[in-house]
Design a protein with these regions (language model features):
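Hydrophobic hinge/microswitch elements
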Residues: 54-59, 64-67, 123-177
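Central regulatory/effector-binding core of bacterial HTH transcription factors
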Residues: 16-78, 145
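Beta-alpha-beta core module
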Residues: 43, 79-85, 89-90, 104, ...
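Short, well-ordered beta-strand segments
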Residues: 18-22, 71, 94, 118, ...
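Flexible hinge/capping segments at coil-to-helix
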Residues: 12-13, 80-117, 121, 201
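Short helix-loop hinge/linker segments at domain boundaries
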Residues: 1-20, 40-41, 79-84, 103, ...
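Secondary-structure junction motif
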Residues: 101, 115-136, 199-207, 217-218
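A late-sequence structural motif
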Residues: 31, 177-220
């Protein structure tokens, strides 16, 4: 029995190939290093090429065209891909340290409406706009930025407040306070492939590993 188990493990270790993974910056920073490390311990001969998209639709296009074998994106997917939902990423309000309402739980709606607001660039802010609409808030948008790290730095420097998915604000390199909105809103993150029936073995192994890893670690 042991020899059979060992033979299977040897075969597993021999698995090789190249997987092209498309992602967006918060997943690339928060999840991918840990996912790739744990996957590499199981399959040391599978290589990766990372593509970071500025917009979700760019990631979808890469998967459709075959430039990427799989990709992280938010639901709903518009291009008829095979998707595996992974994680409900809760939206959070971020404010500078020392903000007078930093300790409020939940954060007051009227403050969101009156303070200078730093908005994530359109195209990636669908859930944020929907959440503001549902709260009946029309924020005073003073700045619009494309990069989540830029927004974190601006909030940290007291230029305004923002509403961003938790994965973007988790482990912020800049000091900020993360606050709970008056209601819960989410961005749904998934991993997608063009056709789950036509995956290379190495891509299938990686997608399965991602699903397991996020189920175990996604909420930490």
């Amino acid at each position: 029995h042991h020899r059979l188990v060992q033979a299977a493990a040897d075969l597993k270790g021999m698995e090789s190939g190249l997987v092209k993974v498309a992602s967006f910056s918060s997943v690339s920073a928060q999840w991918l290093p840990l996912i790739l490390k744990s996957f590499g311990e199981l399959y040391p001969n599978i290589e990766f090429e990372m593509l970071t998209g500025d917009y979700y639709d760019q990631i979808e296009s890469w998967i459709v065209s075959g430039e990427a074998d799989c990709g992280f994106l938010r639901l709903p997917s518009l291009k008829g891909l095979s998707v595996y939902p992974l994680h409900q990423d809760q939206l959070k309000i971020i404010v500078p340290c020392g903000h007078p309402q930093a300790d409020c739980n939940p954060f007051p709606v009227e403050t969101i409406a009156t303070e200078p607001f730093i908005r994530l660039e359109e195209g990636d802010d669908y859930e944020i706009r929907a959440a503001l609409d549902e709260m009946g808030v029309h924020p005073h948008v003073r700045y619009t930025a494309r990069e989540d790290r830029t927004i974190l730095a601006m909030v940290s420097n007291g230029l305004g407040i923002s509403l961003l998915p938790e994965l973007m604000v988790h482990n912020s390199p800049y000091p900020i306070v993360i606050c709970q909105p008056p209601r819960s809103f989410y961005r749904q993150i998934a991993i997608a492939v063009k056709d789950k029936k036509a995956l290379s073995n190495s891509t299938r192994l990686f997608v399965d590993h991602v699903r397991r890893w996020v189920a175990e670690n996604g909420n930490k």
